[in-house]
Amino acid sequence: MTVIRLTRIGRKKKPFYRVVVTDSRKRRDGGWIESIGYYNPLSEPKDIKIDKERLNYWKGVGAKMSERVEKLSQKA
């Protein structure tokens, strides 16, 4: 199954996340199909960018969003 979730990049104690489309069987930071945005929780205000067009495309072909990505997509 295809899922839309966060993958962590950045340094130790300085998280930065990509919003990616991946297979649900892959590890959190494993390979991904497409990167559709990013999330920086440390900046003020929190920096969120998600490509709505690509998000809607992947939802249309059956990808499920994680709970965190659902909350972030409402804020973006």
Curated annotation (Swiss-Prot):
Highest taxon, organism lineage: Bacteria
GO CC term (a single one): small ribosomal subunit
Annotated keywords: Ribonucleoprotein, Ribosomal protein
Signal peptide region: none
One GO BP: translation
Gene3D superfamilies: 3.30.1320.10
Example GO molecular function: structural constituent of ribosome
InterPro entries, A to Z: Ribosomal_bS16, Ribosomal_bS16_CS, Ribosomal_bS16_dom_sf
Similarity field: Belongs to the bacterial ribosomal protein bS16 family.
Name of the protein this chain belongs to: Small ribosomal subunit protein bS16
